[in-house]
């Protein structure tokens, strides 16, 4: 029995079939092809993990090693054979630096006391609408929400009535 189990891939063949069927160019494929795909996927994951582990051991000073997303994205960025994965596993960036570079807009609605805001000018600049962006009148939004709440709910016979929480 153990000898038979060692001949099977660790990745379920049914998962390979499911993933293959999501491809719009899917054609009928034999069971052997799915098994080969499962084995090659297993070998690829093993190789990626080993390469990531060896790079992480070089860069980290601790004896115990736990791989994380940062290690994986660094290995993909540094090793040529994994460059094709750079879009799927991008390098993480600090949110504060992205806000400073105006790559991301970040608005604090209710700042909590734990958040350290560098200066009020930066927050005011971040909250100003960009050129061409329509300004939102809060009174109009509140009026629309109240109007929607005042409308009676209608249901067809096919739809179940939502459970009331009262």
Swiss-Prot record:
Residues 112-166 are annotated as: Disordered. Heterotetramer. Consists of four subunits: POL2, DPB2, DPB3 and DPB4. This is DNA polymerase epsilon subunit C. Residues 115-151 have a biased composition (Acidic residues). Residues 152-166 have a biased composition (Basic and acidic residues). Its main location: nucleus. The gene is DPB3. It is found in: Nucleus. It comes from Kluyveromyces lactis (strain ATCC 8585 / CBS 2359 / DSM 70799 / NBRC 1267 / NRRL Y-1140 / WM37) (Yeast). GO terms for biological process: DNA-templated DNA replication. The lineage of its organism: Eukaryota, Fungi, Dikarya, Ascomycota, Saccharomycotina.
């Amino acid at each position: 029995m153990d000898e038979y189990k060692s001949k099977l891939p660790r990745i379920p063949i049914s998962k390979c079939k499911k993933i293959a069927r999501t491809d719009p160019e899917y054609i009928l494929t034999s069971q052997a092809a799915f098994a080969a795909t499962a084995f090659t996927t297993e070998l690829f994951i093993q190789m990626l993990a080993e390469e990531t582990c060896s790079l992480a051991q070089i860069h980290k000073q601790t004896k115990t090693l736990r791989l994380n997303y940062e290690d994986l994205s660094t290995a993909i960025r540094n090793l040529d054979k994994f460059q094709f994965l750079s879009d799927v596993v991008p390098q993480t960036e600090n949110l504060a630096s992205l806000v400073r570079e105006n790559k991301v807009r970040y608005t604090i609605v209710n700042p909590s006391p734990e958040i350290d805001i560098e200066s009020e000018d930066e927050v005011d600049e971040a909250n100003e609408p960009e050129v061409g962006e329509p300004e939102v009148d809060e009174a109009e939004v509140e009026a629309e929400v109240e109007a929607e709440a005042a409308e009676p709910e209608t249901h067809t016979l096919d739809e179940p009535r939502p459970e009331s929480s009262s």
